[in-house]
């Protein structure tokens, strides 16, 4: 029988634990409710700050590639994960991994990485180049651009989560 339960930590983080006995894999996904449609945030002093479009997408890459222990994907690969990635949507950013073995070791590395990021200007510049490359590739994808233009005509909220190259 499948079971789901929510746990709320002292810091307010809510965790959903869902057990599905029909699966042989373990899936962990962490969501932050900060995505491509967010252009401001509230700092620890309660002040609202403006940010550039694409910031959530840039942070998605930055966090994944620059933990205090290095690249999160590379660190998890050592434990034979099935896959690992991050993604930015309009309303949220998520990070995940799937594994069959070494679940607790992978979970520890994953959480340590996500919550312990190493910031520097050089790392930020390198990450920006990767994001610019992704934006350029997206602009050159004719099929996606046709779909995006069609969706633009159907919906009023039509911002890309990738951001721009500016």
Please place each PLM-identified region on the residue numbering:
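Internal, well-ordered alpha/beta segment that forms a basic, Gly-enriched binding/recognition surface
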Residues: 94, 98, 133, 138
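N- or domain-start disorder-to-order transition segments that initiate the globular core
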Residues: 1-26
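M16/MPP (pitrilysin/insulinase) zinc-metallopeptidase core fold and M16-derived inactive scaffolds
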Residues: 27-109, 159-165
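Scaffold signal of the M16-like zinc-metallopeptidase fold and its non-catalytic homologs
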Residues: 62-67, 113, 138-166
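Acidic/histidine-enriched alpha-helical segments
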Residues: 117-136
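Short, flexible active-site-proximal loops enriched in glycine and acidic residues
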Residues: 83-89, 103, 119-125, 142-146
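Short beta-strand/turn micro-motifs at beta-sheet edges
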Residues: 15-18, 82-85, 150
